[in-house]
A protein has these predicted regions:
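Short secondary-structure junctions
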Residues: 128-135
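Oxyanion-binding "anion nests"
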Residues: 136-157
């Protein structure tokens, strides 16, 4: 892993140069996730939401998980406060990641995610005996700001 402060990014006909404090980095294409001054200045003019989630990797004694069936954006669990969905990423017949995700302005308390995860596992996966072997959570900021307008052929914002 490289740790450096990026001072600027410039491109020419053949390459992109990422100018760092320690050294320069070169590539054919660069993904630049730094917010620009225009975005910061106009932040309040755009819709902003958070995608926030809690996921559990569960292990079951019985082989009840369909390892060939990925469940994406299942909206059957309803939370009237905002848009939410659950997804299932199976690893084995007895092991899967189940994650409950929201799109909203504010995050939830941990017990809200847990309630809906337990409900989904029992009601839709029909699993009552399981062990949580790993947990993950996160918050991803989202906006309607048109970053693509700040992109070029070799730099994606």
């Amino acid at each position: 892993m490289i740790k450096d402060n990026i001072l600027k990014i410039r491109e020419d006909n053949e390459k992109v140069v990422v100018v760092g404090n320690r050294k320069n980095y070169y590539g054919k294409h660069v993904f630049d996730s730094r917010p620009n001054k225009k975005f910061i200045r106009e932040f309040n003019n755009y819709t902003t939401l958070k995608q926030h989630f809690l996921g559990w990797i569960i292990k079951t004694k019985e082989k009840k998980i369909n390892k060939k069936s990925f469940v994406f954006m299942d909206y059957r669990i309803k939370d009237k406060s905002s848009t939410a969905f659950t997804y299932v990423l199976p690893f084995k017949k007895n092991k899967a990641l189940i994650e409950h995700t929201y799109f909203s302005k504010n995050e939830c308390e941990k017990n809200v995610y847990e309630k809906y995860l337990m409900e989904y596992i029992e009601k839709f996966l029909k699993i009552s005996d399981y062990e949580i072997i790993e947990s993950e959570s996160g918050v991803i900021p989202m906006t309607s700001y048109p970053f693509y307008k700040d992109s070029s052929k070799k730099i994606t914002k």
